[in-house]
């Protein structure tokens, strides 16, 4: 089958090579990926609506290389102006309805990778993102405990956490915020949050940026920097697992390995969109920024930024500790 037309949100979308296998071990096709997003459209659109999207493209499936397209291809009907970390302007893909997600799948996208800000104001995030990533020797059960601590601390600071499986080994917890703060301020709040969780769960949670020093569940505060993305809720990942929202009453029982394309189809039929309501009560970031003020007053400065970002004022050396020791030799 060379080309079909998919009806999505009242629009006819041209879709080529629908029977192309993107998951060789499972036999899932390009059309299977599109149908997944059509099935869970209310949640997938809610997660990406008006957000600039990096296009992570797997043109030859998950058994081959992928590449990122940051600037929106001219074939897409929707794009939004943004500023990249270099301060250069650009235009990125954006989702208005599920037909725009199908357009992304047509380009070889499997998982959706939106910014935490929305058009028209893409400079001020409306989402705080907590990415809990277990290091070797730790696993999903450890992420459950850290996620529970994150929920409690968010509530203490007037924010509501919304958890989901990452589609890999970890958990993501999102909190909606008013779009009043810059990316720098949101990242600063995320770093203070992560450090407080590390204090509450010593030996289990970690904020160590350098992998050689990490032990435990890493809270990746840098995911809140401009142009960083995390797979959106309801994304099908290259692992073959869906990044599945769950209720806090499930934090002790949710099994990420059950969230395959087929398993998630049954879950969606049973529970529907568990992110319904996430946009209803955005919170204030002031409580977390007060924690950042206290950390800095106590002598805790910034942490390293990702390597491709411009050097930041007050940032420590962006060199891994073992390399520094070797150089000082």
Residue ranges of each PLM-predicted region?
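SsDNA-processing nucleotidyl-transfer enzymes
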Residues: 2-9, 38-136, 140, 144-148, ...
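Short beta-strand
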Residues: 55-58, 161-167, 207-211
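C-terminal accessory nucleic-acid interaction domains of nucleic acid-metabolism proteins
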Residues: 1-34, 45, 49, 108-127, ...
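Nucleic-acid 5′ end/cap handling module spanning
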Residues: 141, 164, 177-179
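Catalytic palm subdomain of template-directed nucleic-acid polymerases
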Residues: 174-188
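Catalytic micro-motifs at enzyme active sites that drive phosphoryl/nucleotidyl and oxygen chemistry
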Residues: 115-119, 159-165
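Long, well-ordered alpha-helical scaffolding segments within enzyme catalytic domains
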Residues: 36, 140-159, 186-201
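Short, conserved phosphate-binding/catalytic loop or strand-edge motifs used
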Residues: 165-175
């Amino acid at each position: 089958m060379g080309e079909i037309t998919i009806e999505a949100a009242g629009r006819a979308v041209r879709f080529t090579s629908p029977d192309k296998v993107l998951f060789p071990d499972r036999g899932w096709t390009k059309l299977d990926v599109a149908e997944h997003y059509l099935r869970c459209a209310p949640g997938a659109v809610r997660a990406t609506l008006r957000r600039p999207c990096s296009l992570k493209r797997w043109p030859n499936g998950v058994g081959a290389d992928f590449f990122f397209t940051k600037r929106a291809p001219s074939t897409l009907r929707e794009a939004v102006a943004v500023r990249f970390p270099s301060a250069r302007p650009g235009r990125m893909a954006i989702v208005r309805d599920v037909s725009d997600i199908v357009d992304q799948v047509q380009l070889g996208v499997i998982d959706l990778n939106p910014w935490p800000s929305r058009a028209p104001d893409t400079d001020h995030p409306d989402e705080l993102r907590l990415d809990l990533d277990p290091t070797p020797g730790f696993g999903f059960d450890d992420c459950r405990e850290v996620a529970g601590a994150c929920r409690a601390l968010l509530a203490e600071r007037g924010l509501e956490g919304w958890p989901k499986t990452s589609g890999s080994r970890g958990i993501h917890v999102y909190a909606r915020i008013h779009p009043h703060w810059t990316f720098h301020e949101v990242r600063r709040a995320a770093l203070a949050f992560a450090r407080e969780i590390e204090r509450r769960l010593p030996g289990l949670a970690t904020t160590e940026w350098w992998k050689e020093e990490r032990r435990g569940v890493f809270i990746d505060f840098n995911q809140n920097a401009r142009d960083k993305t995390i797979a959106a809720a309801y994304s099908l990942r290259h692992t073959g697992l869906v990044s599945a929202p769950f209720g806090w009453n499930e934090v002790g029982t949710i099994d990420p390995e059950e969230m395959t394309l087929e398993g998630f189809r049954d879950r969606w039929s049973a529970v529907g969109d568990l992110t319904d309501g996430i946009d209803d009560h955005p919170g204030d970031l002031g409580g977390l920024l007060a924690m950042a003020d206290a950390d800095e007053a106590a002598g805790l400065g910034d942490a390293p930024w990702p390597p491709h970002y411009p050097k930041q004022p007050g940032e420590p050396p962006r060199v891994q500790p073992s390399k520094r020791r070797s150089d000082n030799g």
